[in-house]
Regions:
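Alpha/beta-hydrolase fold catalytic core
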Residues: 1-50, 72-73, 199, 279-284
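Active-site loop/oxyanion-hole signature of alpha/beta-hydrolase fold enzymes
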Residues: 32-35, 77-117, 272
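Conserved HGGG/HGGXW glycine-rich cap/lid loop of the alpha/beta-hydrolase fold
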Residues: 35, 41-85
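Gly/Ala-rich beta-loop-alpha elbow adjacent to hydrolase catalytic centers
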Residues: 118, 122, 126
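Flexible "cap/lid" loop of the alpha/beta hydrolase fold
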Residues: 127-132, 136-168
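Conserved alpha/beta-hydrolase catalytic His-Asp/Glu region
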Residues: 150-156, 164-223
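Conserved loop-alpha-helix segment in the C-terminal half of the alpha/beta-hydrolase fold
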Residues: 227-264
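Catalytic active-site module of serine/aspartate enzymes centered on a nucleophile-bearing elbow/loop
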Residues: 253-284
Length: 284
């Protein structure tokens, strides 16, 4: 009787949603410095899609992608050290160590064919991860990142920006997050993201931002020979021709009118572009 009841519930669920539930399994693995890294894994397939969040975010920001892409790929969403459910016992939150976090997960899962997908700061992180993972990586997808590989900010500008976060982290972060949404954005989504990111541990967030500001991707890019696609909003200019000096196989797809968190703002449109980009990388 219980079996029949369960089957009836499953049929009702599939009829209502048009799909099966994707059950993500949460695991942990230690990074190179011993910090525990939490990640979710779901789906099957020869190719792994590894999603890396941005500054002061976590793996839940990819919730609109995990279920869809788990039908055909092994989907992995990672909490970098100091974020989400991962350990917070790291002294300095560098892009290089974040890259080690990603590499530790991929190597632990023994995935030999990977596309790395990184949002915002995650774009820098996956460059470092690609360097460490070598020929396991078939391509890189940035999400509203890689606007310019060349840093045009002075040290004074960087330090001044960082000081505002150091002096009043919550207020500055909320204002910073709101500025990255378009004026017509869903106010509940804006509030949710602003509240979430401003609740990050300030010392970790400031460390990560400082290291991001002083991170130079060019040396890493010059040693990578990988196709790179970026899906960006049109709020910020992208130095396409300048970037092509450092990445020969480079493409940008724009979502007009979207903000920085495009995978949350317009998930269906974003998922279409992501699906297209994955297909392009796998067919190169």
């Amino acid at each position: 009787m219980k079996r029949i009841y369960f089957i009836m519930l499953l049929i009702l669920f599939v009829s209502y949603t048009g799909n099966f539930l994707v059950f993500a399994q949460t695991e942990k693995v230690k990074s190179v410095d011993g910090v525990e890294i939490s990640f979710d894994i779901s789906g099957n397939g020869d190719t792994g899609l590894v999603f890396v969040h941005g500054w002061s975010c976590d793996k839940s920001y990819w919730q609109n992608q995990a279920e869809l892409f788990s039908d055909n790929y092994k989907v992995v969403a990672i909490d970098l050290a100091g974020h989400g459910n991962s350990g917070m016992n790291r002294k300095d939150y560098t892009m290089e160590l974040f890259g080690d976090d990603v590499a530790a997960v991929v190597n632990h899962l023994k995935i030999n064919k990977v596309i790395l997908i990184g949002h915002s700061m995650g774009g820098s992180v996956i460059l470092e991860a690609a360097k460490k993972l070598g020929n396991k990586v078939v391509g890189i997808i940035g999400v509203d990142t890689y606007q310019s590989f060349v840093d045009n900010w002075t040290s004074e500008q960087k330090d001044g920006f960082l000081k505002s976060f150091h002096d009043n982290f919550v207020l500055t972060t909320k204002g910073f997050v709101r500025s990255m949404f378009p004026q017509n954005a869903d106010t509940l989504l804006v509030k949710k993201v602003a509240d979430d990111m401003s609740s990050a541990p300030p010392e970790i967030a400031v460390s990560a931002m400082r290291n991001l500001f002083y991170y130079d991707p060019v040396p890493t890019l010059q040693n990578l020979n990988l196709p790179l696609i970026s899906i960006n909003c049109d709020m910020y200019p992208v130095s396409i021709e300048e970037n092509k000096k450092y990445v020969k196989d480079y493409e940008v797809k724009f979502m007009k009118g979207a903000g920085h968190f495009l995978m949350l703002e317009r998930p269906d449109e974003f998922n279409g572009l992501l699906k297209e980009s994955i297909s392009e990388l796998l067919n190169k």
